[in-house]
Design a protein with these regions (language model features):
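Long compositionally biased, domain-poor regions of proteins
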Residues: 23-162
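Activation corresponds to long, low-complexity, non-globular regions
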Residues: 1-32, 36
Length: 162
């Protein structure tokens, strides 16, 4: 079976990715961002396609990779968490775990079919948290969506209407 132009078919290793931000986010200092599937801090997974004589393939976007992203937090000020698609149109879901409670967010909130089309400035507010405990984000890059994406952490004093 010939490979299509996307060249995504293959067998990959590293389908479960544990990312831990090495420095705690401090809400007293200012805003921060965690970027996912950018092929810099978070490299694309590499595999091979057995149907084309073990041709090397790269999953540009890490589609199908399950992420657990742990963000330690500290500071004195509550902070807002935003989802920011940077690579184009995006639609999917993320689960955020904080202080023993879990919440699932649809991105976008399903009032629109997708967000981020033609702009890297679209954001969706997810929730507000108090610092001092780790924030854990579970997600899998949605197929047919565009990456990379960012999670923005912004002190509430810098965000109007939160």
């Amino acid at each position: 079976l010939p490979m299509d132009s996307v060249m995504l078919r293959g067998t990959y290793t590293g389908a479960k990715r544990q990312l831990v931000v090495p420095v705690a986010y401090n809400s007293s200092v200012g805003a921060a961002a965690v970027e996912v599937a950018n092929d810099r801090e978070d490299p694309f997974v590499v595999g091979h396609d057995e149907l084309t004589h073990d041709m090397k393939v790269t999953d540009k976007g890490n589609y199908g990779v399950s992420y657990d992203i742990t963000i330690p937090t500290q500071g004195r000020e509550p902070f807002a968490l935003y989802f920011n698609p940077m690579g184009g149109a995006y639609a999917g879901s993320v689960e955020v775990e904080y202080n023993g409670k879990s919440q699932i967010f649809d991105v976008p909130d399903w009032s629109l079919p997708h967000m981020g089309d033609g702009t890297m400035y679209d954001t969706q507010y997810l929730a507000t948290y108090n610092p001092g405990k780790p924030l854990v984000i579970h997600m899998m890059p949605a197929g047919a969506s565009n990456l990379p994406i960012r999670f923005l952490l912004i002190p509430v004093s810098l965000v109007p209407n939160v």
